[in-house]
């Protein structure tokens, strides 16, 4: 990667407020530096101390880090624990009646669930899974609405040592099918439908379609939660109603004690080369990362009401809905709906209603709400808030300032968190009682995280110059491998050409400023970031080319003030170039096609048609040229090797 010049200049800085510091878990830069130096002096001992402090072990570990077979690192691997026990049972002696979850439905129904009630529901469902013959090590795909039942399903899997793979409810039947096949799932947990923004979306019908696509004989059971009550097709020998499965089950289910390295879940994330990657996380190391970040980054206190708006189909929903908040005994809000239904103040109404103290959402949501003006949030009482968080993509400085001044009323710290599906928990983020914030920067690594920006050789990049973002030492919450694909894991995350394969390569470019703060600059591969979600170009291109009208396709991202990026598709049809009316009709057909193949989130915003794609005479796609075309920029690249220059004019036409 050539050196990247940083053009962002941001000089505003916001030290932690004295009132916040007085009550913070980590107070001041001296405390932060002391923790960081402790980790440098005794790296393994630092993490062992935290693991003993925050995790309840059935069998204590004696080994800390096994680095004898890099990059396949192991942590605490002679210890035993159960994740569900750590999230539920250990709270029952002191706070069984404390509210664990405040659920707010799409239509405004509120359900409160205590730790005792949640424990009972998880045990009943886990017993139901066992009654179906599901055992430790089996894989289950979860395709659920954003309701308490999704958390119950995940926790029940963890309770009996079953590896769950959650699929976002907006993904298509084909996406569900691919994940079922790759995981070798023995069961699918779903619902009749989900409701979002006043609309219903089929889930069970999508699962049925997925199971009819190929050899899915590994799936012997489909468990269906009755949500909307709509009529759905039924296969009596395979399908089971959730309520029938759990009705006669005991409220107690002995946890299965598993090795610290036992896989807790796989979560599929987009790659730049087509097939989604099954990111595999361990039990103990993953949980430790979630707990530590709840304590440090979110500065958790027992009276907090925590609300992370993410769906459990994404890693943020795993770490900061299903596992992190419950492991520390927090009360949290779970929301089924969208920010603007049935009115544009829905987020602020929920914060006011439930006295939310910690609010964690995506820049996409923030940008969409900015457009509605500052008057709207001012109608609501947001005085309960004490901390704001941002996740999913870098937040631009002006959105940060709006979030801080309008929502946080210039008193709530904003924690801009950098992390990934693969890291499992926060890596770089401002500890709010210690680190001064800069709008647009994720600031400094957490203690124990050895992050750096390096050039192609693995040497430190110059200050202010872009380079590869890496983590130089293994850390407990990192992915262990890619499901059934260890070589892809090694080549993707520990490539031999950077520092001999010893560094974790994040796939992001970044630079550091004069204070050592990290600034994320974007992806170094061809993964798109649409509304905070990573989507592979190859997957979308493959879907387009699968349509009988399409001969070739390439997609790139185009900056969008609300969604971060939108997808622009450059398409070569099998026939001649269409006229304007035909082009509009074909473009809409292809948009719908991609939505059905992958999911609505992958729907191209723009489709442009040309006689062929811009390639060099050696046949290499000129993707950077496409990015310039998508953005309406003046072409500055050398086009002397372009095979057919006339297509530049053709691809300038937006449909």
Swiss-Prot record:
The modification N6-acetyllysine is found at residue 620. It is an enzyme of class 6 (ligase). Pfam families: ACAS_N, AMP-binding, AMP-binding_C. One of its GO terms (molecular function) is metal ion binding. It catalyses: acetate + ATP + CoA = acetyl-CoA + AMP + diphosphate. One of its GO terms (cellular component) is cytosol. ATP binds at residues 392-394, 416-421, 508, 523, 534. One of its GO terms (biological process) is acetyl-CoA biosynthetic process from acetate. Its EC number is 6.2.1.1. It comes from the Bacteria. Keywords: Acetylation, ATP-binding, Ligase, Magnesium, Metal-binding, Nucleotide-binding. Transmembrane segments: none annotated. Its cofactor is Mg(2+). SUPFAM superfamilies: Acetyl-CoA synthetase-like. The keyword ATP-binding applies. Acetylated. Deacetylation by the SIR2-homolog deacetylase activates the enzyme. CoA binds at residues 196-199, 316, 531. Mg(2+) binds at residues 545, 547, 550. InterPro entries: Ac_CoA_lig, ACAS_N, AMP-bd_C, AMP-bd_C_sf, AMP-dep_synth/lig_dom, ANL_N_sf. Catalyzes the conversion of acetate into acetyl-CoA (AcCoA), an essential intermediate at the junction of anabolic and catabolic pathways. AcsA undergoes a two-step reaction. In the first half reaction, AcsA combines acetate with ATP to form acetyl-adenylate (AcAMP) intermediate. In the second half reaction, it can then transfer the acetyl group from AcAMP to the sulfhydryl group of CoA, forming the product AcCoA. PANTHER family: ACETYL-COENZYME A SYNTHETASE, ACETYL-COENZYME A SYNTHETASE 1. Belongs to the ATP-dependent AMP-binding enzyme family. This is Acetyl-coenzyme A synthetase. The gene is acsA.
């Amino acid at each position: 990667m050539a050196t990247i010049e940083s053009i962002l200049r941001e000089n505003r800085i916001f030290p932690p407020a004295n009132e916040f510091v007085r009550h913070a878990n980590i107070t001041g830069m001296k405390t932060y530096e002391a923790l960081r130096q402790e980790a440098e002096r005794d790296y393994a001992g630092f993490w062992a101390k935290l693991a003993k402090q925050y995790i309840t072990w059935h069998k204590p570990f004696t080994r800390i880090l096994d680095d004898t077979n890099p990059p396949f690192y192991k942590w605490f691997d002679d210890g035993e624990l159960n994740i569900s026990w750590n999230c539920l049972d250990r709270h029952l002696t002191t706070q069984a009646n404390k509210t664990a979850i405040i659920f707010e439905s799409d239509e405004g129904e509120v359900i409160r669930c205590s730790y005792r009630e949640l424990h009972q529901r998880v045990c009943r469902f886990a017993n139901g899974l066992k009654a179906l013959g599901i055992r430790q090590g089996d894989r289950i795909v979860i395709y659920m609405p954003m309701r308490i039942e999704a958390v119950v399903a995940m926790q029940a899997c963890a309770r009996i040592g079953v590896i769950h793979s959650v699929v976002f409810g907006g993904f298509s039947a084909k996406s569900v099918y691919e994940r079922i096949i790759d995981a070798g799932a023995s069961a699918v947990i779903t619902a009749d439908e989900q409701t979002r923004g006043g609309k219903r979306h089929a889930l069970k019908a999508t699962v049925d379609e997925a199971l009819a696509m190929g050899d899915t004989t590994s799936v012997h059971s489909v468990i269906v939660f009755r949500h909307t009550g709509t009529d759905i097709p039924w296969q009596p020998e395979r399908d089971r109603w959730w309520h029938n499965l759990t009705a006669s089950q005991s409220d107690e289910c002995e946890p299965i004690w598993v090795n610290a390295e036992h896989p807790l879940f796989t979560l599929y994330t987009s790659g730049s080369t087509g097939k989604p990657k099954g990111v595999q996380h361990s039990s103990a190391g993953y949980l430790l990362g979630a707990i530590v970040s709840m304590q440090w980054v979110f500065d958790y206190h027992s009276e907090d009401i925590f609300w992370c708006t993410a769906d459990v189909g994404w890693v943020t929903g795993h770490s900061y809905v299903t596992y992190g908040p419950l492991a520390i005994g927090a009360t949290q809000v779970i929301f089924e709906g969208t920010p603007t239904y049935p009115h544009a103040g829905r987020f602020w109404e929920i914060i006011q209603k439930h006295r939310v103290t910690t609010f964690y959402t995506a820049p996409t949501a923030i940008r969409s709400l900015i457009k509605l003006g500052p008057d709207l949030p001012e109608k609501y009482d947001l005085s309960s808030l004490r901390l704001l968080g941002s996740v999913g993509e870098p937040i631009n400085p002006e959105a940060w300032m709006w979030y801080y001044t309008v929502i946080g009323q210039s008193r709530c710290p904003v924690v801009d968190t950098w992390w990934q599906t693969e890291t499992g928990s926060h890596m770089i983020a401002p500890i709010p009682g210690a680190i001064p914030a800069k709008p647009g920067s994720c600031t400094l690594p957490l203690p124990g995280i050895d992050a750096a920006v390096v050039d192609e050789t693995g040497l430190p990049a110059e200050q202010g110059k872009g380079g590869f973002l890496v983590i130089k030492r293994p850390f407990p919450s990192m992915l262990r491998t890619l499901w059934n694909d260890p070589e892809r894991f090694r080549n993707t995350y520990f490539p031999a050409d950077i520092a001999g394969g010893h560094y974790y390569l994040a796939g992001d470019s970044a630079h550091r400023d004069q204070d050592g703060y990290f600034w994320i600059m974007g992806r170094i591969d061809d993964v798109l970031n649409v509304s905070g979600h990573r989507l592979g170009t190859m997957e979308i291109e493959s879907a387009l080319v699968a349509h009988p009208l399409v001969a070739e396709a390439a997609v790139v991202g185009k900056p969008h003030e609300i969604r971060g990026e939108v997808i622009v598709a450059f398409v070569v049809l099998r026939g001649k170039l269409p006229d304007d009316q035909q082009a509009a009709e074909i473009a809409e057909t292809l948009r719908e096609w991609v939505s059905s193949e992958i999911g609505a989130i992958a729907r191209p915003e723009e489709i442009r048609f040309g006689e062929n794609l811009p390639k060099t005479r050696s046949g290499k796609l000129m993707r950077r040229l496409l990015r310039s075309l998508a953005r309406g920029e003046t072409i500055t690249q050398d086009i002397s090797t372009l095979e057919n220059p006339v297509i530049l004019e053709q691809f300038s036409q937006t449909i």
